[in-house]
Amino acid sequence: MIVKLINGRMNWMLMVAAFAVILFSGCSGHNERPDLDSSNRGTIHISVDESFKPVIDSQIQVFEALYPKAKIIADYKSEAECFKDLIKDSTRMIIVTRGLTDEEEKFYKDSLTFYPAFDKVANDAVAVIVNNSDPDSLFSMDKIRGILDGSTGDKQTAVFDGLRETSTIRFAIDSILKGKSFDPKKVFAEKNSLGVINYVANHKNVLGFVGVSWIGNKEDTSQLSFLKKVRIAALECTCPEGTFVKPYQANIERRRYPMVRGLYYILKENYNGLGGGFANFITYEKGQLIFMRSYLWPAKMNFTIRSATLN
């Protein structure tokens, strides 16, 4: 009888202990959230404006070399598609040419109960490229505006990385044409920035519009090959001297070059995840140096401007 009682109590205690272990394990797993990535490990997809592909490829390459357990998969697309991905929750991080508007901030605050983080990490320039055989490589903004809206009657045409939804198109409509429309007989589209470069290389009297990171880095062998096919045009300076300037870093930093825009990240992440880790990386020294070496101008750190030449 005593043996049965002892055995019964032991069985009951074992059941309680097993239940406690299961309960503790469940709580511990919830607190640690092992299913989630951290700031330096895991895998995430990010959506990136295609005009920044060369420099963001460089950022990811260095980040993953520093953190071998981290994998960042960049999907390059138009800026409008990046914002659509953010709304649809198909990505938690995008890299584009603007931050959130007040209306967008309110939308995310209402739907997420927290504000997404965003910040400008670099300044970029929209470069104008021409065929090596073209005699003219100096343009006023009035001349460029006239080519885009067809008011000059000139034989020159323009090519962009798409006819809608790209950041370069938005910049041209908002900042050059001031809301007016393109002349459809004068403006054509390629699928991406590389297509723009190749089109200009094979056609005379065409102005191509691309982000400077596609053709500014002479340490990149592929970009050196581009510069054998096309030339970077000089645009009328915003300064009072009336000179013409190319998108050198000094001209980007001082806004002497007339077509400067920002590079922003927008992050929809409310824990210390891989998106935040990558955002911190491109914000601080190593990432800022990569922007510098890619001939953009860093927005978060001060650097000495060195002499550089773009063909």
Task: Give each language-model segment a name.
Residues C27-P68, I87, D119-D124, I129-N311:
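Exported/periplasmic ABC-transporter solute-binding proteins
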Residues M1-S25:
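Sec-dependent bacterial lipoprotein signal peptides
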Residues S47, I73, R92-I95:
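Short, conserved beta-strand segments within well-ordered enzyme catalytic domains
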Residues K77, I95-R98, E103, K191, ...:
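Short beta-strand and adjacent tight-turn residues that come in two discontinuous sequence segments
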Residues A80-S111:
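Pocket-flanking alpha-helical
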Residues T113-A117:
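Periplasmic N-terminal soluble interaction domains immediately after the signal peptide in Gram-negative
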Residues K69-F83:
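Central regulatory/effector-binding core of bacterial HTH transcription factors
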Residues K4, K106-K109, D220-L224:
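Short secondary-structure transition/capping segments
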